[in-house]
């Protein structure tokens, strides 16, 4: 189980909204979710009332290489700050197509552990793709029990759209 290591403490009061971004592989040019996260954190980087926590893929296709980002500050082997967001890397075993599910589950575990360990009040967990399938209910319940809210990108439910129905 991965634990966010930085120990980076913030004022944990109602003035700071902690937002955990799950589902993008990196920040930047890999794809749509990655570009969304890059632009979102860039736009809010000087806003002291929002603190982003971004899960990034540590290895494999589309992995996060923070050395390619201007002004990224390395905290540890698995963490760095970029656009004032705490980015944490999730190591993924090479297990074929199941990597995406493993990555999201590991990222959500790290997110929940960080919320609990740092006593984060009213966190928001934004999931960019619905790849967790049967694990969704477990994490929704766990995050709600920790006082958080879960937001799911509707594109993660592409298969549910009427245009694909038989």
Regions found by a protein language model. Name each.
Residues 99-110, 122-155, 159:
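An aromatic- and histidine-rich active-site surface loop
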Residues 114-122:
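Glycine-rich phosphate-binding loop signature in dinucleotide/nucleotide-binding domains
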Residues 32-40, 103:
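Conserved alpha-helical elements of sugar-nucleotide-dependent glycosyltransferases
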Residues 1-17:
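Non-catalytic membrane-proximal stalk/linker segments that position and tether the catalytic domains
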Residues 166:
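Membrane-proximal helix-turn-helix segments that form the acceptor-binding/catalytic region
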Residues 16, 21-30, 43-98:
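N-terminal strand-loop element at the rim of the active site
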Residues 47-53, 120-121, 147-148:
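A generic structural motif
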């Amino acid at each position: 189980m991965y634990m966010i290591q930085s120990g980076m403490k913030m004022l944990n009061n109602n003035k700071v909204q902690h937002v955990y971004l799950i589902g993008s592989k990196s920040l930047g040019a890999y794809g749509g979710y990655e570009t969304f996260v890059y632009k979102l954190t860039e736009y809010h980087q000087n806003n002291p009332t929002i603190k982003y926590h971004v899960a990034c893929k540590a290895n494999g296709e589309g992995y996060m290489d923070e050395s390619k980002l201007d002004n990224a500050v390395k905290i540890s082997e698995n963490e760095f700050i970029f656009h004032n967001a705490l980015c944490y890397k999730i190591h993924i075993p090479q297990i074929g197509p199941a990597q995406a599910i493993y990555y999201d589950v590991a990222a959500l575990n790290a997110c929940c552990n960080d919320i609990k360990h740092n006593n984060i009040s009213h966190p928001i967990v934004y999931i960019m793709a619905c790849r967790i399938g049967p694990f969704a209910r477990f994490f929704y319940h766990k995050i709600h029990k920790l006082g958080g809210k879960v937001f799911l990108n509707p594109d993660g439910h592409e298969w549910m759209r009427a245009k694909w129905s038989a």
